[in-house]
Each structure stands twice: as structure tokens, then as C-alpha cells.
Regions:
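Nucleic-acid processing machinery
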Residues: 2-334
Length: 334
């Protein structure tokens, strides 16, 4: 089992195929290898890839789903005419999804090993890997224009107040339209007084529980009963969004992430746990990709920053962009 060639996503990114064909080939070869090597984690990995394939192939439901999200956009435009806000939706990109899957394997095995000085069973690992709920995600980003509130601190406070206000109504609004909110199971439980008690168990609050890299956001997961799939909603102020997209949470975080991954590699003796070894190696290979050298249909890059992604390989597929600019650019709002 140890000697077999390890199948990686990187092997399929240089032949001009579409993202869908890449997924198909990768999942097929990984499954064959998993069966012949009796690698149960690779079988779970295959099911994960098939889930993404299914999303890309049968995505008609996204029209109906994003229509319901749009109703919340209309509600906000009516309730908060003085706020600027944007709604964005995306299907997680193939490279990010693959990185996240392998990252989960590495993180879970490392944490388990640190605690118990042994490795988790495949069943335990399988349970952990069964919780991908954010392949589809929508984000609401709000901003209070300067012309309404001059003072920076006061503006930030107002935005956070409105963010929690929106969080308080979002759950019921979507549940009335065929979604079911998933309890967060105590993860990043909010301590904010602005969040209503009855919705608190459903939110993961990265505002009252800021990540070390400065990432701040409110997350809630829903099950779409008509599409039979999960989707995540993220709520951020523009400042929080900037930190996530172009700030330390994006760049410095990358350096720190590599450092902590190397620390995990050093802690787990090579050859003792093939699931860790392979997931770590796959993750490292993805991080070392030179995007300009890839040959994928509808994808091009000049370097790892200048990217034109028309297929959801690296950036994710856009479902909806809606922008609402504050209607009152001159009048100060009381």
C-alpha cells in the first residue's frame, strides 16, 4: 500500500481538460487506487469529489435557490436604504475544495495524535470528513457610507449593530422559504448581546471569537429542502471582507498556515499513518502550484495573483452578484 503511486489533483491540470472532465478522471482514478489499496479515506475523498461533480452537473436548482436569496436582498434594500451592501454567491473552487479536504485530514489526525498519542480510526475520521457544508456559500457584505456617519469608530459600531440585526432576521426569513438552519454545535458560540437568544445556537461568530489572522465574520449553515443540499451564509462588514479577501487573513495567514502545517508534519512520524502522509503531500503540492503553467480549459494566469478564471478552478464559480448602493448619498441619517 505504501509503495503505490499516490494519485493527486495536480496530475490532471496540464492537459487542457475542462474542470468537469478533470474531476471525472481524478475521481475515477482515485477510486480505482482506493479499491486496490484498500484505502478507505480515499473512498471518502471520492464521494466528496462526486458531490462537487453533482453540483456542477445538476445546478438548475441554483436558479431557484438564488431567487430566494434575492428576496432577502429586496427585503434589505427596503429596510436599509441608507446602507450599501453586496450579495455574492459562489460554488467553492476545485482547488480550494481539494485543499480543504486534505487540510481537514491533516488537522484532525494531528489534533487526535497530540491528545491521544495514537491515530483515529477510519470511522472517526470519516465522521469528521462528512461535515462539508460550504461547497455553496452566499455572502452579504454591508457598509455605512461616510456621508451618513462621519466618525470612523461610530460608523464601525453602526455597521456591527446592523450586521447582527440582519443576522437576527435571516434565519426565520429563509426557514419560511424552504430552508432549515443547522445548529452550530457550540462552535464559535457568540457572546454578543446583539444576537437574539433564539438564533444564537445557529451562528458561528468569528466577530466575538476573532481568528488569529484577524478573520471576522458571522456564519450560518442551511439545508435547502427543495435542492437537498447544504449552503452557508456569511455576513460581514466591508472592513471584515477586506481583511478576509485582501488583508492579513489572506496573505500573512498563508505564511503562518505553512508554518503550522510544517509543525504538524514534524510531529507525526513519516510512514506511521498513510492517511496523514498522503493528505499532507497533496496539500503541499497544491500550495506549490504555479498557476501560469496550468493548462485547463477556460483558465489562464500570468502569475499566482493575476488570474482569469472562467471555470471555477481556482476562484470559485459565481452564482450571484447583487450590489445595492446607498440611496441617500448626501443626507445625513439621524
Amino acid at each position: 500500500m505504501q509503495g503505490a503511486h499516490m494519485i493527486t489533483l495536480n496530475d490532471y491540470l496540464y492537459s487542457g481538460d475542462t474542470v468537469f472532465k478533470i474531476l471525472k478522471k481524478y475521481a475515477h482514478d482515485l477510486q480505482e487506487s482506493a479499491v486496490s489499496n484498500q484505502n478507505e479515506v480515499d473512498l471518502i475523498h471520492c464521494r466528496f469529489l462526486m458531490q462537487i461533480m453533482d453540483l456542477l452537473e445538476h445546478n438548475d436548482f441554483l436558479t431557484a435557490q438564488s431567487q430566494k436569496i434575492r428576496e432577502f436582498y429586496k427585503y434589505m434594500a427596503k429596510e436599509y436604504p441608507y446602507l450599501s451592501f453586496a450579495f455574492k454567491g459562489r460554488i467553492k473552487s476545485l482547488i480550494r475544495a481539494e485543499a480543504k479536504f486534505n487540510g481537514y485530514v491533516v488537522e484532525y489526525i494531528y489534533d487526535y495524535y497530540e491528545k491521544h498519542a495514537t491515530y483515529p480510526s477510519v470511522v472517526e475520521l470519516g465522521e469528521k470528513l462528512n461535515c462539508f457544508r460550504d461547497l455553496i456559500a452566499y455572502r452579504i457584505v454591508i457598509s455605512m457610507p461616510k456621508c451618513h456617519v462621519k466618525d470612523k469608530k461610530e460608523r464601525e459600531n453602526q455597521e456591527i449593530k446592523y450586521l447582527y440585526e440582519i443576522a437576527n432576521v435571516l434565519k426565520d426569513f429563509l426557514e419560511e422559504r424552504g430552508f432549515t438552519a443547522e445548529p452550530a454545535g457550540g462552535v464559535k458560540k457568540s457572546t454578543s448581546k446583539l444576537l437574539r437568544e433564539e438564533v444564537r445556537p445557529y451562528y458561528r461568530d468569528y466577530i466575538t471569537n476573532v481568528d488569529p489572522d484577524g478573520y471576522r465574520s458571522l456564519h450560518i449553515t442551511f439545508f435547502d429542502n427543495s435542492a437537498k443540499c447544504y449552503m452557508e451564509m456569511q455576513l460581514r462588514t466591508k472592513q471584515m471582507d477586506d481583511i478576509a479577501e485582501i488583508g492579513p487573513a489572506n496573505h500573512l495567514g498563508y505564511e503562518k498556515k505553512q508554518e503550522s502545517e510544517r509543525r504538524r508534519r514534524d510531529a507525526i512520524p513519516k510512514g506511521e499513518c498513510i492517511y496523514f502522509d498522503e493528505a499532507y503531500e497533496r496539500g503541499m503540492q497544491l500550495q506549490q502550484l504555479e498557476l501560469k503553467n496550468l493548462d485547463v480549459n477556460m483558465f489562464a494566469a500570468v502569475n499566482n495573483s493575476l488570474i482569469n478564471d472562467g471555470c471555477g478552478l481556482y476562484r470559485g464559480r459565481l452564482i450571484l452578484p447583487y450590489e445595492h448602493l446607498s440611496r441617500f448619498q448626501n443626507d445625513l441619517i439621524d
